[in-house]
Each structure stands twice: as C-alpha cells, then as structure tokens.
Amino acid sequence: MTYSLYEHNRVKKFFKKHKRDKVLLLRITKKYCEILDNPYNAEFIELTSVKCPKCHRARVGNYRIIFYVSEKYQRIEIIDIIPRKNDYKLL
C-alpha cells in the first residue's frame, strides 16, 4: 500500500529554520522514507493525546516527528517536528 505525504505549515517553517543543518535534514528525510514504507512500524509509538488521539511519533535524535496516518485518503500527514525537551507540551 502506497501513501502520499503531506506536510503542515509548521513543518515547512521548521525546515526553513534549520536549512543550514544538513545532517539533521538528511536524517529527517531518511525517517520520512521509513514512515512512508511502513507507518505502523513498532518503532513509531502511538500517542494518547487529547488533541491528536491517533497520531504517531517517530524519533530522530533530539527531535520527534509527529504524524497521522489517514487510511481513507491513503496519506500520511506530518503534523510537526518538535524538540524532545518540548515533546508533549504542545500536544
């Protein structure tokens, strides 16, 4: 099953802010490929947040990729990339 990828504006803002950190951006794009291959991997933990009850989290160093899998539209929505220290205060 193939999924399309959709990024929210907060993710685009994150990439603009960190465009000089090529190593981090490369690690995030590799994790994107892993998410697209298998979004229900055991490595990606499902969150129990009130605001986003069916969201998952993927770990990339000190950052977390928060994403949602929409089976209806066959798409993965990357909601946000947040630092670990602010991990769940925003959700």
Predicted regions and their residues:
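Conserved short hydrophobic interaction patches
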Residues: K31-E34, R84
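Alpha-helix N-cap/helix-start and coil->helix boundary motif
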Residues: K12, N41, R84-K85
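Residue-level signal for beta-strand positions within conserved beta-sheet cores that form or flank
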Residues: M1, E43, K54, Q74-E77
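Short, flexible helix/strand-to-coil boundary loops that buttress conserved ligand/catalytic motifs
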Residues: I28, P39, L91
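Residues that form or immediately flank small-molecule/cofactor binding pockets and catalytic motifs
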Residues: R10, S49-C52, P83
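Enriched for short, Lys/Arg-rich terminal
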Residues: S4, K16, V23-L25, V60-Y63, ...
